[in-house]
Amino acid sequence: MHLKPYWKLQKKEHPPEVSRETQRTPMNHQKAVNDETCKASHITSSVFPSASLGKASSRKPFGILSPNVLCSMSGKSPVESSLNVKTKKNAPSATIHQGEEEGPLDIWAVVKPGNTKEKIAFFASHQCSNRIGSMKIKSSWDIDGRATKRRKKSGDLKKAKVQVERMREVNSRCYQPEPFACGIEHCSVHYVSDSGDGVYAGRPLSVIQMVAFLEQRASALLASCSKNCTNSPAIVRFSGQSRGVPAVSESYSAPGACEEPTERGNLEVGEPQSEPVRVLDMVAKLESECLKRQGQREPGSLSRNNSFRRNVGRVLLANSTQADEGKTKKGVLEAPDTQVNPVGSVSVDCGPSRADRCSPKEDQAWDGASQDCPPLPAGVSFHIDSAELEPGSQTAVKNSNRYDVEMTDELVGLPFSSHTYSQASELPTDAVDCMSRELVSLTSRNPDQRKESLCISITVSKVDKDQPSILNSCEDPVPGMLFFLPPGQHLSDYSQLNESTTKESSEASQLEDAAGGDSASEEKSGSAEPFVLPASSVESTLPVLEASSWKKQVSHDFLETRFKIQQLLEPQQYMAFLPHHIMVKIFRLLPTKSLVALKCTCCYFKFIIEYYNIRPADSRWVRDPRYREDPCKQCKKKYVKGDVSLCRWHPKPYCQALPYGPGYWMCCHRSQKGFPGCKLGLHDNHWVPACHSFNRAIHKKAKGTEAEEEY
């Protein structure tokens, strides 16, 4: 399938002047012949393979490949179409280039029917702007129409390399950013030609090109979003939970994103295209909730100057139907059940340039967000995102189920630890508040490093007087909780159920009782002083709560019912209380494998088998006193009293010859496969046939004198 780099006359039906000229001066008139034969619309089927392509060479694909028929495409004569060569220089050349070193190959060279060069034209991808034709597409993975088989190098490599570089420049300029609403299926429509005046309607793009195309459009969308959205609110990502409870995704923007709305923000859009209205509604609800709480600032609240100049990380609030449960560092709060008030969004990304302008609103939204929060539902989990911290300065809080609180505090060297954590630990007495603080310095970072963020999550649970535990679950009963306690009876039943449990579980119950007492006393006094849980006590009770989280949920009725069911299902040991003569009769009816199992299971059964000399029902030991001392034919073991062992070794005395090679040895013939010795591995000392007359005579003589006990 190699194309020759020299001119070769393929058909004799050509005009004589063309064939003579190509035979005499092939290299001088090569470019002219290429322009006349390939650029014109009248193309004969015996086009010569060109060794090099000019910059203006552009060839149209064949619709019908026929060797002797002139294909009229535009209705012009060959002379007229050859004069229009210079007007078509902007059209892209339909060439195939194999790698960086090889030159372009003329894939429109069609010769004899059945030739391999004709197949090349069949397999060439149709990337011209006028026609799509009836050609095959060999693969949609070919990049830039590149063929997959090896071709010979063309003669003029310099021109080929220049043309390849031009094609790559054209491809890099072709992808114009478009709105993100256009899906992946429209990627092939937006491929613009070299001159920029046309599109390739059906061009198959590779995966790499589609990915680059989508990245270009995503960056264009981000630039447009930074112009439209003044504050760049957090975009919501649905991560597999219920439809009404999305999670807050990451949103990053430049430090001056609030003062300069036209600046591009590195905003990653993660919501599915099927639910855009739900995302917009939730963003509007978040904004309205933040605006609602702006007027509730207290005098001793958190200052913006030292902690609000940070970037927003990622908070995952999952698996909840009561979505009004927590807030992020910038006042972003989930509120699907609140009223929709689509006002301007409260600032999510606050840079140093807008610190003075946004501080009162942000402080009010931050301080007022803990007023009407319902208790923490099940499955809320906060964790650390990718963080750049000093060594030993991380905080991770994980609430794995609704009954235990796991907190790890390693605030050692954070520059904002003394002020931030004290504010994050203070919670009002009537709610369970979940805070998430994402603090990353923006001043020392360029836009490439802005994706590194810290997510510090702190969860502190408070207990009311009427509900003396942190087990405040939903109103509807959860499936599978039949034997579990209601939340009000948890502490009283847990203390009496786990009397024999570990020391950690008792400490956990004492911790909960102490927390309940503190909250009750605070509510009776009516003071608004928040309850501050010390970090050392929370850190010390981490293994305690985790170890006892599953034991303390079960009621006493369930334990009693389970014990009764276990007693009914437990096998009763009646056999050990039977008299010996009944047990001996039962054992003599058992095969060898069953007796082996009984002997190895219980010492009492082993004593009975050996003392009463119990033989298995399928035993092959000879009972005749003349042969009872004979060993096993297979393993040469002699019989002892109470031996119920299996024979573990089989000789293979029989040779099975094969016609095509060495045979194999067998322990028995095929007709004796049902014999117990082959299947079970029983001991056998039958050396002499029992029905022999000599054996009968000897047996009669020894019958009167035999006084030994039969084995």
Swiss-Prot record:
Substrate-recognition component of the SCF (SKP1-CUL1-F-box protein)-type E3 ubiquitin ligase complex. The keyword Glycosyltransferase does not apply. It holds the Pfam family F-box-like. The gene is FBXO34. Keywords: Ubl conjugation pathway. Residues 1-36, 249-271, 337-372, 494-529 are annotated as: Disordered. The keyword GTP-binding does not apply. Disulfide bonds: none annotated. This is F-box only protein 34. Residues 10-23, 354-364 have a biased composition (Basic and acidic residues). The lineage of its organism: Eukaryota, Metazoa, Chordata, Craniata, Vertebrata.
